[in-house]
């Protein structure tokens, strides 16, 4: 019997074999912990992070979904400053639901195309 974490890691590796980011269309990777949410835009060919945002520095207390939406807005703004308009969305083995969905929707509303 596999745990939730083992299941997520299996899905993550299965998806990562298919999804790769380039300089023209980098990969937007989401990591979700119990308290925080982190988003990176990565060029896999050069192995560099082009933009990153997280909920670590946020001081105001908000529900987790609202925090995720703010992080999505921040990453969209940073991506546009770096000249990135289209990305490949990597949900990192998480279900496209809840905080992961909020990040994606906020990034789309901020101007990123998936």
From Swiss-Prot:
Keyword presence, RNA-binding: yes
Pfam families: Ribosomal_L18p
Organism expressing this protein natively: Bacteroides fragilis (strain ATCC 25285 / DSM 2151 / CCUG 4856 / JCM 11019 / LMG 10263 / NCTC 9343 / Onslow / VPI 2553 / EN-2)
Family: Belongs to the universal ribosomal protein uL18 family.
The protein's role, per its UniProt record: This is one of the proteins that bind and probably mediate the attachment of the 5S RNA into the large ribosomal subunit, where it forms part of the central protuberance.
GO terms assigned for molecular function: 5S rRNA binding; structural constituent of ribosome
Keywords on record: Ribonucleoprotein, Ribosomal protein, RNA-binding, rRNA-binding
PANTHER family: 39S RIBOSOMAL PROTEIN L18, MITOCHONDRIAL (PTHR12899), LARGE RIBOSOMAL SUBUNIT PROTEIN UL18M (PTHR12899:SF3)
Subunit structure, interactors included: Part of the 50S ribosomal subunit; part of the 5S rRNA/L5/L18/L25 subcomplex. Contacts the 5S and 23S rRNAs.
GO cellular component: cytosolic large ribosomal subunit
The encoding gene: rplR
BP-aspect Gene Ontology terms: translation
Protein name as annotated: Large ribosomal subunit protein uL18
């Amino acid at each position: 019997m596999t745990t939730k974490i083992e299941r997520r890691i299996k899905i993550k590796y299965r998806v990562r074999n298919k999804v790769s980011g380039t300089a023209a269309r980098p990969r937007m990777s989401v990591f979700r912990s119990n308290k925080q949410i982190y988003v990176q835009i990565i060029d896999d060919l050069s192995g560099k992070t082009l933009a990153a945002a997280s909920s670590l520095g946020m001081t105001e207390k908000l529900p987790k979904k609202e925090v995720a939406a703010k992080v999505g807005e921040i990453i969209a703004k940073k991506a546009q400053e770096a000249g990135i308009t289209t990305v490949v969305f990597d949900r990192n083995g998480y279900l496209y639901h809840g905080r992961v969905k909020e990040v994606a929707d906020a990034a789309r509303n901020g101007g990123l195309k998936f």
